[in-house]
Amino acid sequence: MPRNISFKAVGPIGETEINALPVKEVGPAVGYYTQCLGFTLVSRDRTTAVLRRDDVQIGLAVNGQDPEQASCWFSVGDVDALWREYEAKGIGPGIVDEQQYDGKPYRVFFAKEPYGVCFCFTQL
């Protein structure tokens, strides 16, 4: 995995709790996040898991919340390289688009995990 992709920051979109992203089952979710999204497992029990990639740490939780209502953003070093990594793994990320925030351009793409959590990957 190229180092220039580097996950730098994570934040919630809406009411999503970054340390408790909702999943239906911890085991399959950990498999997806590690094998497909490139995270490393830090800790796990029956209903929760903590994962890390570079400078970013997230949590998964079987907490009764609807994964389809959860979303978060990740700031990465090279959004195009990450898009290629995920495309090669069959994740089917959305197109990379250039947008503006506060008059400054940034690159972005979106992807969903199997339970429905939506991710926004950005490069400022």
Describe the predicted segments one by one.
Residues 28-29, 46-49:
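Short glycine/proline-centered loop/turn elements that form peptide/ligand docking sites
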Residues 1-30, 57, 70-72:
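N-terminal beta-strand motif that seeds the catalytic metal site of vicinal oxygen chelate
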Residues 1-11, 15-24, 50-52, 63-124, ...:
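Vicinal oxygen chelate
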Residues 36-41, 90-93:
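Conserved acetyl-CoA-binding loop of GNAT-fold acetyltransferases
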Residues 43-45, 62-63, 123-124:
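Acetyl-CoA-dependent GNAT
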Residues 40-45, 97-100:
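Conserved catalytic-core motifs of GNAT/GCN5-like acyltransferases
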Residues 33:
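Terminal peptide-recognition signature
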